[in-house]
From Swiss-Prot:
Induction: Induced following exposure to ionizing radiation. One of its GO terms (biological process) is regulation of transcription by RNA polymerase II. CDD domains: KRAB_A-box. One of its GO terms (molecular function) is DNA-binding transcription factor activity, RNA polymerase II-specific. Disulfide bonds: none annotated. One of its GO terms (cellular component) is nucleus. May be involved in transcriptional regulation. The lineage of its organism: Eukaryota, Metazoa, Chordata, Craniata, Vertebrata. The gene is ZNF443. Keywords: DNA-binding, Metal-binding, Nucleus, Repeat, Transcription, Transcription regulation, Zinc, Zinc-finger. SUPFAM superfamilies: beta-beta-alpha zinc fingers, KRAB domain (Kruppel-associated box). It is found in: Nucleus. This is Zinc finger protein 443. InterPro entries: Ikaros_C2H2-ZF (IPR050589), KRAB (IPR001909), KRAB_dom_sf (IPR036051), Znf_C2H2_sf (IPR036236), Znf_C2H2_type (IPR013087).
Length: 671
């Protein structure tokens, strides 16, 4: 095996190069360095406490010199006195480099592989730094120093450029400038993506074999680092260290503006940009800016269509690793995090915490109009559209505009019929599992969201929130003409009553509608589609609302009660019609009993109860009735017996069943 010098193990990046690396490359580099140094027998370092990313905030110390500094002083404070031959064979062998003999330090007699490493080592050991810069002010390191010194003249020149801002080396591909030639060369290599060590499975190239070895674990699934507390295993040492903080709760990085603390420096930096608004990472295709490189990388995949993360169980691919992890939990039924307010359960703690913000409204990002808080800026931006009415996502097929991208994607499936989640009952497809689950409740009639005040249940959480405002009386959206609305959607719909605008037109008959759902409902009159079926009598309906109203025939529910006479009705239209009876003048009076009516036809029907006249006869059984409506009700009893053979209306007291609701009511009076 060929020998490798220590400087081949310790690789430098400048501040500019470090900024160019993506999050995956940074993490991989950290893992390699941590794992490599852990394998050095004589280099006993406190690497676990070392934040590699911090070194690239202030890249003023040569990393190789730092390593050799620690090489001189062992962990217990004694001199190392060990030779390179004692380093593990996997890192450095006993043989020297071709043509280069082992160089011995005159300071302590240690042997170090390679002349440049020796130079650095001797200078560190002797404290000899011939190039000193006297204008350098206080450093942001743990100790303050003036007049920073350097072991090499080129390092001294590069450092000077930090103060002058001079960057004489330009990249011809992207135009970015660098303070040193080495930085430019490394930057160009990163941009080209070339390297001598290539992955046999995916073809990705790397500059160092150790990076390739770490990358190969993404294919093999090898996880050598196991947490002692929860037995969770990790492919990379840095991931293991990050995970450890979930047990200890350590959050060493605190924001000076809002005092929020973070376990990782990268998370802290990302958070800081929410205050400053800085977005240094731009998409090369559409120039959209992002606060961190990972968000930019994820966004760029929307242009390329790349989805590198695949589920092993179902083969579904994702552009983000977090999306894959969330998806994998859908194969497991376990949801350990349950909301005590609404009963909704979650697979992940983060999802649960975000959900709780919906109840409390205490998120860090506040809406200036209504004061509601959100967990992230994107959620706040989406919410602000409910106030502004902005709808940036427009469907090219039907012209409908939507406020949110997720709503737009769901809407497009209505046209295409494509979607990963298909309903087994009606075949309708959906993009998101949450929307699919909500749709399934239209078939099962499940209502998991209950009002704490009145006990009324709803299929959708938004319907519950809308209902809760009927108790509080809150109506924040006011029309200029005086009417107030519960939510922004109702307010927008109300405005069309003044303008008369009807933007949604049926392509078949040309009829226009003010709301998209009215158009969708109307389309079923052309297609004849009736997806909602009554479980009792199997009658089908084109609209869910019609099914709900129909079900009252079987249940006997009469939610609309007249305050004047106490009469109850199953349907709102009948109730409103009845209310007018009390409001109108009753000028038609029965001469026999004195009862008054608003219309002459009502009086004529009533008079038949005195005369015993029954002009309306049933052709099937010969039974006669005083009114046509009574005959129609009677005919339904024949239809039900013929077609269903059942009596759906059962008396709860004696168990006797009846074909019609009116028969059940008459029977109840006998009890």
């Amino acid at each position: 095996m060929a020998s490798v010098a220590l400087e081949d193990v310790a690789v430098n990046f400048t501040r500019e190069e470090w900024a160019l690396l993506g999050p995956c490359q940074k993490n991989l580099y950290k893992d390699v360095m941590q794992e490599t140094i852990r394998n050095l027998d004589c280099v006993v370092m406190k690497w676990k406490d070392q934040n590699i990313e911090d070194q690239y905030r202030y890249p003023r110390k040569n990393l190789r010199c730092r390593m050799l500094e620690r090489f001189v002083e062992s962990k217990d404070g004694t001199q190392c006195g060990e030779t390179s031959s004692q380093i593990q064979d996997s890192i450095v062998t006993k043989n020297t480099l071709p043509g280069v003999g082992p160089c011995e330090s005159s300071m302590r007699g240690e042997k170090v592989m390679g002349h440049s490493s020796l130079n650095c080592y001797i200078r560190v050991g002797a404290g000899h730094k011939p190039h000193e810069y006297h204008e350098c002010g206080e450093k942001p390191d743990t100790h303050k120093q003036r007049g920073k010194a350097f072991s090499y003249h080129n390092s001294f020149q590069t450092h000077e450029r930090l103060h002058t801002g001079k960057k004489p080396y330009d990249c011809k591909e992207c135009g970015k400038s660098f303070s040193s030639l080495g930085n430019l060369q490394r930057h160009m290599a990163v941009q080209r993506g070339d390297g001598p060590y290539k992955c046999k499975l995916c073809g990705k190239a790397f500059f160092w074999p150790s990076l390739l070895h770490m990358h190969e674990r993404t294919h093999t699934g090898e996880k050598p680092y196991e947490c002692k507390q929860c037995s969770k295993a990790f492919s990379f040492y840095s991931s293991y260290l990050r995970h450890e903080r979930t047990h200890t709760g350590e959050k060493p990085y605190e924001c000076k503006q809002c005092s929020k603390a973070f376990p990782f420096y990268s998370s802290y930096l990302r958070h800081e940009r929410t205050h400053t608004g800085e977005k240094p990472y731009k998409c090369k295709q559409c120039s959209k800016a992002f606060p961190d490189s990972s968000s930019c990388l994820i966004h760029e995949r929307t242009h390329t269509g790349e989805k590198p993360y695949t589920c092993k169980q179902c083969g579904k691919a994702f552009s983000v690793s977090g999306s894959l992890q969330r998806h994998e939990t859908t194969h497991s039924a376990e949801k350990p995090y349950a909301c005590q307010q609404c009963g909704k359960a979650f697979h992940h703690l983060g999802s649960f915490q975000r959900h709780m913000i919906r109840h409390t409204g205490n998120g860090p990002h506040k809406c200036k109009i209504c004061g509601k808080g959100f967990d992230c800026p994107s959620s706040l931006q989406s919410h602000e559209r409910t106030h502004t009415g902005e709808k940036p996502y427009e469907c090219k097929q039907c012209g409908k505009a939507l406020s949110h991208r997720s709503s737009f994607r769901s809407h497009m499936i209505m046209h295409t019929g494509d979607g990963p989640h298909k309903c087994k009952v009606c075949g309708k497809a959906f993009v998101y599992p949450s929307v699919f689950q909500r749709h399934e409740r239209t078939h099962t009639a499940e209502k998991p969201y209950k009002c704490k005040q009145c006990g009324k249940a709803y299929r959708i959480s938004s319907s519950l929130r809308r209902h809760e405002t009927t108790h509080t009386g809150e109506k924040p959206y006011k029309c200029k003409l005086g009417k107030a609305c519960i939510d922004f959607c109702s307010f927008q719909n109300h405005k069309t009553t003044h303008t008369g605008e009807k933007p949604y037109e049926c392509k078949e008959c040309g009829k226009a509608f003010s709301r998209f759902r009215y158009l969708s409902r109307h389309k079923r009159t052309h297609t004849g589609e009736k997806p909602y079926e009554c479980k009792t009598c199997r009658k089908a309906f084109g609209h869910y609302d019609n099914l709900k109203v129909h079900e009252r025939i079987h249940s006997g529910e009469k939610p609309y009660e007249c305050k004047e006479c106490g009469k109850a009705f199953s349907w709102l239209t009948c109730f409103l019609r009845h209310e007018r009876i009390h409001m109108r003048e009753k000028s038609y009076e029965c001469p026999q009993c004195g009862k008054a009516f608003t219309h002459s036809r009502f009086l004529q029907g009533h008079e038949k109860t005195h005369t015993g006249e029954n002009p309306y006869e049933c052709k099937e059984c010969g039974k006669a009735f005083a009114s046509l409506s009574s005959l129609h009700r009677h005919k339904k009893t024949h239809w039900k017996k013929t077609h269903t053979g059942e009596n759906p209306y059962e008396c709860k007291e004696c168990g006797k069943a009846f074909a019609s609701l009116s028969s059940l009511h008459r029977h109840k009076k006998t009890h």
